[in-house]
UniProtKB/Swiss-Prot annotation:
Pfam families: E7
Protein name (database record): Protein E7
Function as written in the Swiss-Prot or TrEMBL entry: Plays a role in viral genome replication by driving entry of quiescent cells into the cell cycle. Stimulation of progression from G1 to S phase allows the virus to efficiently use the cellular DNA replicating machinery to achieve viral genome replication. E7 protein has both transforming and trans-activating activities. Induces the disassembly of the E2F1 transcription factor from RB1, with subsequent transcriptional activation of E2F1-regulated S-phase genes. Interferes with host histone deacetylation mediated by HDAC1 and HDAC2, leading to transcription activation.
Assembly, per entry: Homodimer. Homooligomer. Interacts with host RB1; this interaction induces dissociation of RB1-E2F1 complex thereby disrupting RB1 activity. Interacts with host EP300; this interaction represses EP300 transcriptional activity. Interacts with protein E2; this interaction inhibits E7 oncogenic activity. Interacts with host TMEM173/STING; this interaction impairs the ability of TMEM173/STING to sense cytosolic DNA and promote the production of type I interferon (IFN-alpha and IFN-beta).
Gene: E7
UniProt short sequence motif LXCXE motif, positions renumbered to this chain: 22-26
Zn finger region (unnamed): 55-91
GO molecular function, one term: DNA binding
Naturally occurring in which organism (per UniProt): Human papillomavirus 22
Length: 100
């Protein structure tokens, strides 16, 4: 600008914010197979469960509170319905002291 007043020829209009293409053409480097598998594997989701079973010695009601995955709770259920019996503290002491 030359002089005291600006003329149209002296004013240069430019966009202040330049648009950037967000869909750039960059490529990510290839990850080794071991890293790809570890990235794909997610942390298993743990769900809280309340389990009510009866003592294997005196049939007292026992309550268990656990966190388990879906497959873990199914395996635990299979064990409880099969060869595993839980004991209350009283029966545990009796067996421990040789009374049973």
């Amino acid at each position: 600008m030359i002089g005291k007043q600006a003329t149209l020829c002296d004013i240069v209009l430019e966009e202040l914010v330049l648009p950037i293409d967000l869909h750039c053409h960059e490529e990510l480097p290839e990850l080794p197979e071991e890293l790809e598998e570890s990235v794909v594997e997610e942390e298993p989701e743990y769900t809280p469960y309340k389990i009510v079973v009866y003592c294997g010695g005196c049939d007292t009601k026992l309550k268990l509170y656990i966190l388990a995955t879906l497959s873990g709770i199914r395996d635990f259920q299979t064990s409880l319905l099969g060869p595993v019996k839980l004991l209350c503290p009283t029966c545990r002491e009796e067996i421990r002291n040789g009374r049973r």
